Amino acid sequence: MDRLSSHNATKEVVQKYNFKFSKSLGQNFLIDSNIIDKILSGARITRGDNIIEVGPGIGTLTREMGKIAEKVVAIEIDRNLIPILKDTLSDLDNTEVVNQDILKVDIQELVKDKLNGGPVKLVANLPYYITTPIVMKFLEEDIPVTDIVVMVQKEVADRMNAIPGTKDYGALSIAVQYYCDTEIVAKAPRHMFIPQPNVDSTVIGLHVRDKRKYDVHNEDIFFKTVKASFGQRRKTLLNSLGGLGFLNKDEIREILKEANIDEKRRGETLSIEEFSVLSNIINTKVSSK
C-alpha cells in the first residue's frame, strides 16, 4: 500500500468506509508527507525502536513508523476506526492496534506485555482536547519513555517550550521541562489536515533526560509551589505562595530571603532552578514544623 499522507489517499479511505469524523474526539487527519517525514526525523526512529502511538486515525503515521521501527502499538479509542486500521496496516505485522482510551490504559503493563518492557517512544498526532493529560501521564508515571514527539496545538507547544519571563511561561512549561529537553520540530498550518481544524499546530520534541537535572528534595512540594506561584499571575510571590495553605506571610518572607529571591517578583520570572531552591527551603520548613 502507498503512503496515506495525501488529501486524495485519505479521502479515498474515508469514503470507502463511510467514516464520519468525530468532533468530540478531536479527529483531524494529517495529509502532508513533509510533516510526516519531519515527525519521523524528530523522533529519531531506528530499527530497534518500540513506539506507542495515540490516535492513529487511519494509520497514516503508523504505516511510516512500522516500516522503520521494531514494533508500533497504536491506541485508538474510536471503534469505527478499527476495521480501517486493520485494512491499512494489514501488510505490517509489527504493528498492533489497541481499542482503548489512553487515559485508562495501564501503560506500564502495555509496555511489559507488548513492547518487551521498553524503552519506548511516544510519537503521535495527539487529540488536542487531551494533549496535556496524555503527555503528563507518560512523564509522571514510571514508564521507560525516552522521547515524546507529538503534534499539538501551537499554543500548547509554545507553552511547553517557553522560557522564564515570557507570556507563555507557566506551570506546564515547568512540568514538561523538569523532565525533558524541548525542541520545536516543525510547524503545521491548519490546511495540512482534514477536516481543517480552527487552530495551527506544531510538532514538539520532548527528549526525556536519563538523569534528573534539578536537585529537588520533595517533588510534591515542588509542584505545589509552582502551582501556587502561577495561581494568579499578577500576584507577587509574597502573596501567591499563601495559596500553599500552610505558610503565613512572615514565613514566606523569611523563605524568600533565604532563597535570595525578591519578594516582589512574580512566579513567571523564576527559573526551574530557582523553583527548586525555593521548594527545598519550603520543604525543610514544613518538615521541621
UniProtKB/Swiss-Prot annotation:
Protein keywords: Cytoplasm, Methyltransferase, RNA-binding, rRNA processing, S-adenosyl-L-methionine, Transferase
Intracellular or extracellular location(s): Cytoplasm
Key word Calcium present: no
Matching CDD domains: AdoMet_MTases (cd02440)
EC category name: transferase
Highest taxon of source: Bacteria
Function summary: Specifically dimethylates two adjacent adenosines (A1518 and A1519) in the loop of a conserved hairpin near the 3'-end of 16S rRNA in the 30S particle. May play a critical role in biogenesis of 30S subunits.
Family listed: Belongs to the class I-like SAM-binding methyltransferase superfamily. rRNA adenine N(6)-methyltransferase family. RsmA subfamily.
Matching PANTHER family: DIMETHYLADENOSINE TRANSFERASE, DIMETHYLADENOSINE TRANSFERASE-RELATED
This protein's name: Ribosomal RNA small subunit methyltransferase A
Gene source species: Clostridioides difficile (strain 630)
Source lineage: Bacteria, Bacillati, Bacillota, Clostridia, Peptostreptococcales
